[in-house]
């Protein structure tokens, strides 16, 4: 970790990766998830299919299709410099210096080669309703295990929890999932969405009500917390089909679409790109403002996460998303910019 004018900046290191299998997620899953027809896959048989398998074997584990093992290993110097310049232009340097603002921006147009920039990515902050995405993950894990049913009523309740940020819906789903189950899931080796070695992450330690906390996060005593990095990891795993399964990742993403609350990222982005697709969850409580999204338009896809502690935080995020969107397009590698 280095520091630029007092705020934490993730070092830009050489990207490393993992090979064709990620936990329960395999290369074939990735190909199907990203649009390859199953019928087409079946047609790849005989010598062609054998050649494909032999190619993977001969290439060895170091050369098979990769996704990064950790987003912190994908820092892009051009994107990083652009983000820092944008913060200066928006007069937000002081906020980052005092750790009142944390940001992660990841270009995932090519999911096998993400480009990340960040400021204070591991700063744990109160995130209000944003951690409802963790409840969504817990529900789909239960569904995958046959312990919950994805019936129309459950789907409607989860959609209301995410798009309208309904506290009542969140509490209903949280109690069906189980508080202890969710806490264990977030800390599991499979997801590490709450990681003590990275200063925490996504945490849901109480219902969204006046009731007391069930279990505050171990490091910072927060009831509903997040770091920008772990939220970005959630969205990256979602987009690459690694939350629960490729099919259930798609269903979770569809629930995150069409946000009903039009502030922060949505307000800023729709003012300049009204046709953009936003898969999003935000949070607001007093001076705490957070937003997170996968954003798609004009051939590019990226993850944006920002957490702020300021009465002006909502305005910060509306302005920031416009600058980050512009940066994604201006900093795109030449080969991708043509797509």
Language-model segments: which ranges?
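Bacterial N-terminal signal peptides
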Residues: 49-57
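Structured C-terminal helix/loop/strand segments within mature extracytoplasmic catalytic/sensor domains
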Residues: 65-87, 223, 233-339
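A short, well-structured edge-of-sheet supersecondary motif
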Residues: 82-120, 295-296
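Active-site SXXK
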Residues: 124-148, 161, 304
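Short, well-structured active-site flanking segments
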Residues: 141-159, 245-249
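Mid-domain, small-residue-enriched loop/turn segments at the edges of structured enzyme/sensor domains
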Residues: 173-243
């Amino acid at each position: 970790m280095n520091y630029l004018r007092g705020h934490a900046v993730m070092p830009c290191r050489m990207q490393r990766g993992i090979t064709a299998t990620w936990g329960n997620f395999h290369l074939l899953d990735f190909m199907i998830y990203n649009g390859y027809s199953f019928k087409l896959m079946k047609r790849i048989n005989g010598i062609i299919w054998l050649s494909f398998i032999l190619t993977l074997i001969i290439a060895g584990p170091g050369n098979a299709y990769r996704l990064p093992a950790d987003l912190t290993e994908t820092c892009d110097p051009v994107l990083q410099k652009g983000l820092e310049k944008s913060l200066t232009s928006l007069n937000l340097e002081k906020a980052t210096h005092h750790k009142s603002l944390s940001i992660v921006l990841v270009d995932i147009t090519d999911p096998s080669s993400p480009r990340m920039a960040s400021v204070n990515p591991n700063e744990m902050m109160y995130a209000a309703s944003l951690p409802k995405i963790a409840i969504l993950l817990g529900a789909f894990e239960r569904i995958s295990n046959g312990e919950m049913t994805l019936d129309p009523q459950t789907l409607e309740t989860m959609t209301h929890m995410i798009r309208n940020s309904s506290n009542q819906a969140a509490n209903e789903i949280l109690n069906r999932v189980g508080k202890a189950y969710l806490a264990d899931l977030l800390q599991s080796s499979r997801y590490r969405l709450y990681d003590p070695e990275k200063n925490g992450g996504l945490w849901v330690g109480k219902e969204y009500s006046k009731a007391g906390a069930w279990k505050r996060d171990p490091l910072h005593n927060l009831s509903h917390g997040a770091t920008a990095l772990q939220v970005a990891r959630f969205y990256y795993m979602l987009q690459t089909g690694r939350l629960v399964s490729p099919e259930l990742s798609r269903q979770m993403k569809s629930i995150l679409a069409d946000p009903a609350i039009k502030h922060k990222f949505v307000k800023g982005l729709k003012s300049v790109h009204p046709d953009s697709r936003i898969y999003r969850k935000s949070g607001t409580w007093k001076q705490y403002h957070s937003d997170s999204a996968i954003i798609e338009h004009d051939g590019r896809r990226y993850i944006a996460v920002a957490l702020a502690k300021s009465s002006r935080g909502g305005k910060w995020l509306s302005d920031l998303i416009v600058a980050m969107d512009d940066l994604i397009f201006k900093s795109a590698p030449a080969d991708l910019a043509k797509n």
